[in-house]
């Protein structure tokens, strides 16, 4: 593992749960519950960034733009899931808010190895989808370094689209590449 990767928060041992494999079921569930209690405070600290992102999205949609989510693996699945719920929940066109995952629809149910490792595949998505300066592109990457996501946000910025990053690693490469970054850890 290279030094940068080894330094990422997501690659560290969580000292509070390092003995989870030695616990009984109730102990495991209590550890998970304790970790879940951290989430609201972490999100609370990101409210200024979340507000900037929401305002950016609202302005884009009011101006005729669209919102896109991009990610790989679980990050991509979550973006696709969120986007897919907007049509039935809010009555908006499925074209207005879209989720895309490295490896395409097959990757929603099965791992598509190496698709996340191509910055070129990410860049190509912007042209394929006709993303313009009117749109907002959100890159989701727990590590903050997924090449597919970096390719997406870099190319989106090159065409003038606003960019948002969502990651669990503060001071990540993704954070440095986007207009607004939400990094709640």
Predicted feature residues:
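Short, positively charged patches
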Residues: 11-14, 24, 51-55, 66
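Short secondary-structure boundary/capping elements
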Residues: 20-24, 49, 114-121
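Flexible, glycine/charged-enriched surface loops at secondary-structure junctions
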Residues: 42, 50, 174-175
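A short, well-structured juxtamembrane/interface segment
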Residues: 45-62
